[in-house]
């Protein structure tokens, strides 16, 4: 548990109000239920384009449930239902008639534990492309290379593309999962504790990668690590008991929180 606020090793400047920037996604009055359990309670959040937004809060506060709601992954859970709007490109995607396959192509996700397919490194990245109808081998190879480069993995695997993805280290597997997601050319990347199972060196590589990827993608990351949130994010939202307590620029939230619950959490007084 932290006993002091995360250090912000940059010159503090006022972060623009997220509502003043072009939005990649937003939720309006979003509720998520697991049976009778009201897990997310009327959350309104806006995610600016090409920025990193961190979702923080104690275990069980609802941040991962909220993240999974953004590309409708909660639909796969029996007894889960959602109310309210999930806006992507200004369209509410929380509707039955929405094509979830296309939603998850546009809004990619990387999970806490690396989950490569039991296929070759090449096939892990190419698989989704083929499923979406790409047939030209040259085009597929170009997209595979481009995606592996964006995930900072190409130089490490370019001579071993035929090897099993399971032969890679944990950090390499997670970057492969990121490459697999970006190969589909999403606009938004959802990262659920992407470095929590990795060693410090691999974690540093993932964080460097996040800073690179935001030039092309909007990134929303769940993390228990407040130091990590301070390092990689532009905006931070503090969740508690299924509600957003505070949402602001990361520097402002960690150095001048406006809510006592936020202050207590980042100071290590609860959570």
Swiss-Prot record:
Pfam families xref list: ABC_tran (PF00005)
Job description of the protein: Part of the ABC transporter complex PstSACB involved in phosphate import. Responsible for energy coupling to the transport system.
Gene Ontology MF annotations: ATP binding; ATP hydrolysis activity; ATPase-coupled phosphate ion transmembrane transporter activity
GO-annotated cellular components: plasma membrane
GO biological process, one term: phosphate ion transmembrane transport
InterPro entries membership: AAA+_ATPase, ABC_transporter-like_ATP-bd, ABC_transporter-like_CS, P-loop_NTPase, PstB-like
PANTHER family to which the protein is assigned, alphabetical: ABC TRANSPORTER I FAMILY MEMBER 17, PHOSPHATE IMPORT ATP-BINDING PROTEIN PSTB 2
Family assignment from sequence similarity: Belongs to the ABC transporter superfamily. Phosphate importer (TC 3.A.1.7) family.
Name recorded for this polypeptide: Phosphate import ATP-binding protein PstB 2
Gene assigned in the entry: pstB2
Assembly, per entry: The complex is composed of two ATP-binding proteins (PstB), two transmembrane proteins (PstC and PstA) and a solute-binding protein (PstS).
Record keywords, A-Z: ATP-binding, Cell membrane, Membrane, Nucleotide-binding, Phosphate transport, Translocase, Transport
UniProt-annotated binding residues for ATP: 57-64
